[in-house]
Regions:
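Bacterial Sec-dependent N-terminal signal peptides
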Residues: 1-32
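Phosphate-group recognition and catalysis centered on beta-loop-alpha active-site segments
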Residues: 20-304
Length: 304
């Protein structure tokens, strides 16, 4: 991938320091082994608590079998890395600062257009969310990635003998640079800076559907593990996927419906781990374990 002038100029000072931090953190933490079976709370376990919230992450930590906290990141107008899935504030579960609902008449509230000081006023946890009726309702704010990591690391230190792992998604799209997010290189640089500052790089996988993000990570931050997300419509073989990417990712994370025993064997033969998403029944979780997947992502960490 051709590297942008952005990295050479404005980000030129950030990237060398970030890369050094990654290497130092990784070298210092070589004893941190990736979980044999990575059991991941999707968006913190949104079946039980408001998605992407600090409360959800802490609840997931309370389940002994959960090894990994899965989450998504966006960038605000003032370049804060925040933990949220959607490009816009979702009317299905977000309330305005005054407690009223976002209506169809309201202008769409795009994360990338908002300052964090304004974004944090919205409540993402009090409104009943019919897709996840078991979700515990409470006033919840969108967290900065740095603050969420501080909270989860402190909580895990109290509750666990071993630290948590993280699976963090770059929510970029190939045709949306400058619309839903900054240039993908800047997006990744901002995320990696937080991860290295918080000294969790050795315990973090960065994932994305966007092959540009995965390729940039592989080239600019080779010490960080990457996961390539693929959806249910993906038809390429494992070999074709590797060829299209141009390198072998640490993980391929497919929609669980396309995972077969043969697919897992092909990935393992290529040295790739398989961690499917999003698996929300006990029966399907056990079926996937039976075909030797390397992890499972679920909205319901209580099912593990």
């Amino acid at each position: 991938m051709k590297r942008s002038l952005l990295r050479i100029t404005f980000w030129g000072t950030l990237l060398p320091f970030a890369s050094c931090s990654v290497m130092k953190d990784s070298a210092k933490s070589t004893s941190d082994n990736f979980p044999k079976l990575s059991l991941e709370a999707h968006r913190g376990g949104r079946g039980l608590y408001p998605e992407e919230s600090i409360a959800a992450m802490k609840n997931a930590i309370d389940f002994a079998k959960v090894t990994t906290l899965e989450m998504d990141c966006h960038i605000t107008k003032d370049r804060k890395v925040v933990v949220f899935h959607d490009d816009y504030l979702n009317p299905k579960f977000v309330l305005k600062p005054n407690g009223t609902e976002i209506s169809d008449k309201d202008k769409p509230l795009r994360i990338y257009d908002m300052l964090y000081k304004d974004l944090v006023k919205y409540d993402i946890g009090s409104k009943f969310y019919k897709e996840f009726p078991e979700q515990k309702k409470q006033v919840t704010r969108i967290a900065k990635l740095a603050d969420l990591i501080d909270s989860t690391e402190a909580y895990a230190n109290l509750k666990r003998k071993a630290p948590m792992f993280y699976n963090i998604e770059v929510k970029s799209k190939e045709d949306k640079d400058g619309i839903f997010h900054p240039r993908v290189e800047e997006f990744v640089d901002l995320m990696v800076q937080v991860i290295t500052d918080k000294k969790i790089a050795a315990r973090t996988v960065i994932q994305s559907f966007d092959s540009r993000a995965i390729n940039y990570l592989h080239k600019a931050y080779p010490q960080i593990k990457v996961s390539y997300l693929i959806d249910a419509n993906h038809t390429k073989s494992v070999e074709q996927t590797i060829a299209a990417l141009g390198f072998t990712p640490f993980i391929i994370s497919p929609h669980y419906k396309i995972v077969t025993s043969d697919y897992v064997k092909q990935c393992h033969k290529a040295g790739i781990k398989v961690i499917p998403w999003t698996v929300n029944t006990k029966e399907e979780i056990e079926q996937l374990k039976a075909v030797k997947v390397d992890g499972i992502i679920s909205d319901y960490p209580n099912l593990f």
